[in-house]
């Protein structure tokens, strides 16, 4: 199985933490091959789609944000036309609400994840080509072959502290001028404009774990 991660950002100064966060949880699975196509929203969507096509992936995955949403849809619609049998799956803050309208408006997208993916994406990869089994995957939203909408709720990581750190993934991007280190997930504030507002429970890593991970980053240089 070949997964193509489409890393579409506003500029090359940015790097998605979602890719290494997910890859780290399945890095030991020899049946899964990961490849990356990186692009910015300022590049030609047709050229980006062509680059994805050259990899001939089974699955195309990406994170959808406010700033890349429009261009991402242009790219993925072209990818589906070039690779009609590929499975396109998305995640990110754009899918925290009702996803029925989005899926009907963008039928080239096979499914979207609502919530946190580190535990449920590995489960889905075991049945990615068996849509009849998707109803068991928490957080997955999709349309079945008859066009019926299925909403499997919100996925939350049961044990935040037990996750394999993103920096353990070979796909972690060390080339940027800064490194992202997630020490807390969720927020106790309730800002109306923020998708993390009011997210409970707030989960934090132990100070000792944070210290060890900072040391790992330091040792990497």
Q: Where are the regions a protein language model picked out?
A:
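Glycine-rich beta-alpha loop elements in corrinoid/cobalamin-binding modules
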Residues: 2, 25, 33-154
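A short, flexible N-terminal coil/short beta segment enriched in small residues
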Residues: 1-20, 24-25
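Secondary-structure boundary/capping motif
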Residues: 14-15, 68-71, 160, 167, ...
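N-terminal [4Fe-4S]-dependent radical SAM core
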Residues: 1, 137, 142-183
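Core AdoMet radical
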Residues: 5-11, 39-40, 58-68, 92, ...
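Radical SAM [4Fe-4S] cluster-binding motif and immediate context
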Residues: 161-221
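Short amphipathic alpha-helical segment that frequently serves as the phosphate-/nucleotide-binding helix
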Residues: 16-23, 73-76, 211
């Amino acid at each position: 199985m070949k997964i193509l991660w489409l890393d579409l950002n506003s500029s090359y100064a940015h790097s998605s933490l979602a890719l290494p966060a997910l890859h780290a949880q399945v890095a030991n699975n020899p049946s899964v091959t990961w490849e990356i196509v990186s692009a910015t929203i300022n590049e030609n969507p047709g050229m980006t789609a062509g680059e994805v096509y050259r990899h001939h992936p089974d699955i195309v995955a990406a994170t959808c944000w406010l700033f890349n949403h429009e261009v991402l849809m242009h790219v993925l619609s072209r990818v589906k036309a070039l690779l009609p049998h590929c499975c396109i799956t998305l995640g990110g803050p754009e899918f925290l609400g009702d996803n029925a309208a989005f899926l009907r408006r963008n039928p080239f997208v096979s499914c979207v994840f609502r919530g946190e993916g580190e535990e449920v994406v590995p489960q889905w990869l075991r049945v990615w080509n068996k849509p009849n089994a998707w109803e068991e995957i928490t957080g997955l939203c999709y349309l079945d072959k008859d066009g019926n909408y299925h909403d499997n709720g919100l996925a939350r990581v049961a044990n935040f502290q037990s996750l394999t750190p993103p920096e353990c993934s070979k796909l972690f991007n060390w080339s940027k001028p800064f490194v992202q280190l997630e020490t807390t997930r969720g927020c106790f504030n309730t800002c109306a404009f923020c998708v993390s507002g009011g997210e409970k429970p707030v989960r934090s890593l132990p100070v000792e774990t944070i210290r060890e991970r900072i040391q790992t980053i330091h040792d990497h240089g």
